[in-house]
Amino acid sequence: LLSVKKELNNFFKNIYVAPGNHDVKLGSTDERKVFLQVFKKNFNSFFFKDNLFFILDTTINPGNITADQLKLIKNELSKKKKLNSIFIITHHVIWENYVKQNVQSAVKKNFFLNNNFGQLKKILLTYKNYKSIIFIAGDVSVTNKTTKLFCEKNENFYYLMTGMGSKNFDNYLKISISEQGKSVSIVPVFF
């Protein structure tokens, strides 16, 4: 992980990582300790041009957002009177059971049965001054059975799934935000 971070530092001033099960496994593990030594935090937030980004950890309590992360979200939302977009970035597709279309992430269907995505969504809905809420997840695995790229809009909520590992339709998302922060463009980059 340290060598990866050093390489990324050549290109980016700030690096925010949503840890996945290949990075830290599930729960409290030795791999998680190494991850925290390298990246210092397992979840974070930042503002960029009146857009608020949350990078969350869904591996410590598998498929869930922990209480300390929910507290961070509430605190950060209370700091701004108006936002253009709110981005929620996770490894696991915690919203898999909340979209209309059928998506297949890398985990079994029952993985998210007891998750607290509804609680997260309720917190976000209490904040009224935003244009859109964009959920991005990347746990599409190395199998060919998973959905490789997905986008669904439901009211002001956007659900995006991206990822790599199978060598078929591997992709990442390029997010561009206008100078004023009001226009957001998200484009898949395939390789």
Language-model features and meaning:
Residues 80-103:
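Short acidic, glycine-rich surface-loop motifs adjacent to enzyme active sites
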Residues 1-81, 85, 107-134, 142-185:
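Extended active-site neighborhood of metal-dependent phosphoesterases/phosphodiesterases
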Residues 58, 89-93, 138-140:
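Short, well-ordered beta-to-alpha junction loops that form the rim of enzyme active sites
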Residues 186-191:
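Short, solvent-exposed aromatic-acidic interface loops
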